[in-house]
Amino acid sequence: MPTLIALDASLSMLRPVPGRNEHTYQSLATKGIQHLLDNLTAAGKLEHVALLSYSTTAELKVDFTRDYDQVRQAVKKVEPVDKACLMSMLKAVVSIMSPWGNQNILQVVVFTDCGLGFGNTSITGFLEAYAEKESEPEFGFLKTLANYNLNFICLGLHGDYYFTRGLAVYQQLLDKVSLKGQLFMTKPAKSSDAVEGNPNPNPNPSHKSELGRTTVFELIERLCEASYKSSEVTLKCGSYFRMEASVLLWPPTAPYEQKSHIFGREPTIRHTDQKIEVCGFLSLSDIGSPATLSRHWVLPKVEREKSGSSRRSGNLSAAAKPPKLNLDTSNPNYELEKLEADIKEFYAKDSKDTEESGDDDVTIVLKPGPQTEQQKENLCVLLHGALKMENMAALVRVGDKWYGFIYAFTDSKKKSNLMLNILPPGTNVIPWLGDLESLGFPEDLAPGETASFPVRADRRSYSQSSVVWIRQASLQSDVQKVLRHAKKMPDKTQHFYKELNRIRRAALALGFVELLEALAMLLEKECAHLSLNGASNDCTLQLQHAATELRKTSNRDMKSMIVPLQKVGASDAGSTAATAPAPAYMY
């Protein structure tokens, strides 16, 4: 989920905040960006962040990176230039975000004082032009921009007329252009004359409590709560009661708008379930690369340890005995719990935890202290290790007739994590797998029956060079290569048929059957030309054979091959050339 931070670099950002002479709008925006980066750092440093400053033109200060310190340093160096132009910034956002595609959740966070701009480049001027020319190509970038989440951190006072007017125009922009966005603004301060029973109303109320560093931090907290909060779900694997744990999905799952097949019916909004259940396991090679709606990190939920305990109690905890596990005999899982407790107790007896006493045959066992949250067994760790070792993926159910798969993903830094790919709703969303609800086990096959899945290819896609005929010169080059090999037969017979079959398969794959007839005519003309120039008999026979085979309907199959003409018999070794019979050929 990449995030682009846009900072307003207009001259109006240099104004001091009324009631807070130590702060300007730009300094508050800088502190807000720093606080946003701190929140992203606490979330696990999973976000790619870029920094953009805009005025009349937009300038990319820092490209997408996970090095937040680089962004922090660049924010301090942004200097205001001239007037603000929001539309130039939005066009630059579309260009910068284009490499990420539309499958990712793209966030744009804009820090501004809600200036409208001047002249034709103002927001009001844009709305007037857009109302009359919505279908013009110059407004085509708005269709792409509608896929982004626009978050405006509005810095201003509700007592300022220009700020409140700017808020209304910004909201009008989001509504008319149908953009997904939200305005984050401070709450208006209560004036003293609004309080009932106040005998001394203050005509000049202070803005001290309305806009400041604390209120900007509150805006950032609201933004993170709305857009950067992980989805907490329960991951269940099998019927064993211990194989269930709470996990976090990052980025959070978004509602899916499923269109209705009935004309005129409203689309259905679907949400993923709070419990994700593992249905089975498949090889990664069988799944391949199907189309997915979204991808999410699967992170274990770790409770932070409380720091209130003293140092002495922390030292004594290592030597203290762990609380004895009291098992309830009436529990239906009593036998499984007892077996698990015995196994843990057996493997906990390490040689390092034993100590020999002075008496013979006496051993004192030192019990380890209670485990921390990071040392406890976790379902994510177990599932990640198993999937990575076996090179498999877990098929999971995320909703009613809605599936996805979890696998171990390794990034460019060779760090491996669990990744959840959510498929489109339905049971037949991976064509080569068929109905996901009809999958079974390999053991269900009858004796002697072989699995028809997966369908094996005759050749690997990389076994032979690919054929590209986008331009006319490429096709001419391939045909001329065949004719060059034809002139050098019988020395180049194998090369001739190899190139001929390559062109034939490419033509059949593209439905270019006319090329086979044209190639047969070229081979016949080349045969007549070579026979006049005294070419060998083998060369002319091979060319006639190739032209005949190209016209056969039986060779219109992709799996068939045109092979060279083979000799049936040959002359005796001792006979002379005059008495030797002519060699025969077999089709």
UniProtKB/Swiss-Prot annotation:
Keywords recorded for this protein, A-Z: Nucleus
Pfam families to which the protein is assigned, alphabetical: IntS14_b-barrel, IntS14_C, VWA_2
One GO process term, biological-process aspect: RNA polymerase II transcription initiation surveillance
GO annotations of cellular component type: INTAC complex; integrator complex; nucleus
VWFA domain span: 3-113
InterPro entries assigned to the protein according to its UniProt record, in alphabetical order: INTS14 (IPR039841), IntS14_b-barrel (IPR045814), IntS14_C (IPR046471), VWF_A (IPR002035), vWFA_dom_sf (IPR036465)
Biological function: Component of the integrator complex, a multiprotein complex that terminates RNA polymerase II (Pol II) transcription in the promoter-proximal region of genes. The integrator complex provides a quality checkpoint during transcription elongation by driving premature transcription termination of transcripts that are unfavorably configured for transcriptional elongation: the complex terminates transcription by (1) catalyzing dephosphorylation of the C-terminal domain (CTD) of Pol II subunit Polr2A/Rbp1 and Spt5, and (2) degrading the exiting nascent RNA transcript via endonuclease activity.
Oligomeric form and interacting partners: Belongs to the multiprotein complex Integrator, at least composed of IntS1, IntS2, IntS3, IntS4, omd/IntS5, IntS6, defl/IntS7, IntS8, IntS9, IntS10, IntS11, IntS12, asun/IntS13, IntS14 and IntS15. The core complex associates with protein phosphatase 2A subunits mts/PP2A and Pp2A-29B, to form the Integrator-PP2A (INTAC) complex.
Protein name: Integrator complex subunit 14
Species name: Drosophila melanogaster (Fruit fly)
